[in-house]
UniProtKB/Swiss-Prot annotation:
Keywords assigned: Antibiotic resistance, Cell membrane, Cell shape, Cell wall biogenesis/degradation, Hydrolase, Membrane, Peptidoglycan synthesis, Transmembrane, Transmembrane helix
Pfam families: BacA (PF02673)
Record-annotated membrane-spanning stretches: 7-27, 45-65, 86-106, 108-128, 145-165, 186-206, 214-234, 245-265
Chief place where the protein resides: membrane
Entry protein name: Undecaprenyl-diphosphatase
Entry GO MF terms: undecaprenyl-diphosphatase activity
Length: 265
């Protein structure tokens, strides 16, 4: 019989992930904070978070699947694009390399205090991106993103390994500083997130399989489905919000949350 408390927790964490994944405020950071405040910060929760993150990744894949098919040239009925697979590889390779190299050390950073500092640093970066962005866009289409731009975005994406910094915040902020149109920056950011989130979820699961219990699968599935459904329902609206809202607003929000963490803890 399913435990009601576990079901409620699974739903709460799933909703948090489904909403925060598409905003530059760090979904991982918010899940860590929620787990701590709900007093469920244990090994079992790590497995739950893996399933939940995978759910949001699938929603991104579903939402952008047509664009991804164009980029990968799997669909012969669509117009060919200039964005090659190499752009995606350059954008994700640095994070994969450092993520694997420092995997155990990175996991030691998964606590509320480190998230608090990362929220502040990420907030400062968002402010810098908005204040010092070029007055005119140099890149107005995802097909026009250069290999150099992809590589630079990939380098700054490394900061997302610090829980609480925000992967989308790092990539969107960097892209905007490089003169990439905001809507294009958002689109590219989430397309390159798919292999990273799915790969990280799989690798985390392999490393935490000893904590996996088949009896907990229904709870994990509930979290997965809640995350997927909420993400599907929210993604279009939230992406519009990012496109129309100054990054300064998200930076201020991050400062407020980090302040709450400090005073509550």
């Amino acid at each position: 019989m399913l435990d009601l408390h576990q079901i409620i927790v699974s739903i709460i964490i799933g909703v948090i992930e489904g909403i925060t994944e598409f905003l530059p405020i760090s979904s991982t950071g918010h899940m860590i904070i929620a787990s701590h405040w709900l007093k469920i910060d244990n090994e079992n929760t790590k497995i739950l978070e893996i399933f939940i993150e995978f759910g949001s990744a699938l929603s991104i894949l579903y939402f952008f699947h047509k664009k991804i098919l164009r980029i990968l040239k799997f669909n012969i009925n669509v117009k060919k694009t200039n964005t090659k697979n190499l752009h995606i590889i350059l954008a994700i390779l640095p994070t994969i390399f450092f993520g694997l190299l420092f995997y155990k050390k990175i996991k030691l950073l998964f606590n509320t205090y480190n998230v608090m500092y990362a929220l502040i640093l990420g907030g400062i970066f968002l402010l810098i991106s908005e204040i010092f962005k070029p007055k005119k866009y140099k890149t107005c289409s995802i097909n026009d993103i250069s290999l150099l731009q992809s590589a630079i975005i990939g380098f700054f994406q490394i900061f997302c390994l610090y829980p609480g910094f925000s992967r989308s915040g790092a990539t969107i902020g960097t892209a905007i500083l490089l003169g990439i149109k905001r809507s294009v920056a958002i689109e590219f950011s989430f397309i390159i997130s798919i292999p990273l989130i799915m790969g990280a979820s799989f690798y985390d699961f392999i490393n935490n399989m000893h904590n996996f219990k088949i009896l907990d699968l229904p709870i994990f599935f509930i979290g997965f489905m809640i995350s997927f459904i909420v993400s599907i329902l929210c993604i279009k609206k939230l992406l519009k919000i990012i496109n129309r809202t100054s990054l300064i607003f998200f930076g201020i929000y991050r400062f407020i949350i980090s302040g709450l963490i400090y005073f509550i803890n």
